[in-house]
């Protein structure tokens, strides 16, 4: 990478960081709904500059419906959450206002996001067949990849929370996968996820201290595993199918 390209990329990073920090400072003063709307707008503007307005709007909606899945699932199990907050080039997050009482409850909430994300991908695919819109096909592919990545069984991804209800030892597999992905992509976000997953593994001796949290019946574990493998299967098949259509 030449010196001028380094300067140009650095300048873009500074500008994007400045926009994000200004938006974050403003959102601190806002209520939950206004903070969600403001973070959504900031993310939309940044994504629009990078990828174009139409794709950016579709991408924001994919993130929104993913988080909506978590919100619905949390309501089903009787837990309250914050409104989604959108973070440019990271995604969107919600936070629980109450802690789950066991790993099964946490897994149910975690499943909601990828489940809604999978549905969003299939809806985009249906719209592609209906309208022959390449944008819809690309959004369907994006949704599949995002939710497949999010199902990697490591903390802090949804897959890590789902896998914990099956066996916390699945986190070792997730850390290995994210480590391999980083060495293939050199993506900074993947590096952060890899680091967090390693920290979680390092603290894994606390499993015994809080064993009741992970003490689930075989039926509960198998039910979570069924959802997990089902989502992986549907997303995997859809990803391969859409990739073939994009060729």
What is each PLM-predicted segment?
Residues 1-247:
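Hydrophobic transmembrane alpha-helices and their immediate loop junctions
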């Amino acid at each position: 990478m030449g010196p001028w390209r380094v300067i140009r990329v650095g300048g873009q990073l500074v500008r994007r960081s400045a926009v994000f920090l200004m938006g974050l400072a403003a959102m601190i003063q806002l209520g939950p709904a206004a903070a969600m709307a403001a973070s959504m707008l900031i993310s939309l503007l940044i994504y629009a500059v990078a990828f174009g307005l139409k794709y950016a709007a579709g991408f924001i909606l994919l993130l929104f419906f993913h988080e909506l899945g978590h919100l619905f699932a949390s309501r089903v199990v009787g837990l309250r959450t914050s409104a989604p907050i959108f973070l440019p080039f990271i995604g969107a997050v919600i936070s629980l206002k109450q802690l789950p009482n066991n790993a099964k409850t946490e897994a149910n909430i975690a499943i909601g996001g990828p489940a809604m994300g999978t549905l969003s991908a299939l809806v985009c695919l249906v719209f592609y067949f209906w309208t022959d819109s390449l944008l819809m096909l690309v959004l369907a592919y994006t949704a599949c990849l995002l939710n497949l990545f999010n199902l990697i069984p490591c903390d802090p991804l949804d897959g890590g929370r789902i896998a914990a209800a099956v066996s916390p030892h699945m986190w070792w597999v997730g850390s290995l996968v994210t480590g391999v992905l980083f060495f293939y992509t050199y993506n900074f976000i993947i590096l952060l996820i890899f680091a967090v997953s390693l920290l979680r593994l390092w603290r894994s001796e606390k499993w015994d201290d809080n064993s009741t949290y992970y003490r689930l019946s075989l039926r509960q574990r198998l039910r979570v595993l069924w959802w997990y493998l089902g989502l992986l299967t549907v997303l995997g098949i859809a990803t391969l199918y859409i990739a073939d259509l994009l060729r």
